[in-house]
């Protein structure tokens, strides 16, 4: 009996690890603007995660948005916003993307900027960096030079912080 439980646990852990890796690969593909690979990795994710994980839902919407498949992007946004348990970060992000599709740039920017603040407040640096990446594109499109400079500065600070953290980790490993 214990061996059977161990085997089942191992299978569940392997499935979860696969999901984590694929989720990160989808995000990396988005950040690198390699949408074809993003869709490929998304297709490899187990269906149960595609509906339960709002990060993956967001990545899926962004992929469809960036390849100009607005119909599917809106469909996934509508589905997500109809869920009462959705958090404020995702709700604002999805509403911002909907405004973006509907050519309401000012409202879209306002919603997406709020996501940056929510992510930072929650200590979710990776989400904040994703928001900055999108804001960078929006500010370019809307010719908002003063905000664009601020985003570039924030992105640079994040990269410096990430680099500093890596150096600290390396020193810690060498000391051990």
Briefly describe each language-model feature range.
Residues 147-176:
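Terminal, low-structured helical/coil segments at or just beyond the last alpha-helical repeat
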Residues 19-70:
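Long, well-ordered mid-to-C-terminal structural blocks that present hydrophobic/aromatic surfaces
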Residues 4-15, 40-52, 76-88, 116-125, ...:
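Solenoid-like repeat scaffolds
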Residues 17, 23-24, 57-63, 90-101, ...:
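"A position-specific structural signal for the A-helix of alpha-solenoid helical repeats
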Residues 25, 32, 67, 102, ...:
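Structural motif corresponding to the intra-repeat A-B loop/turn of tetratricopeptide repeats
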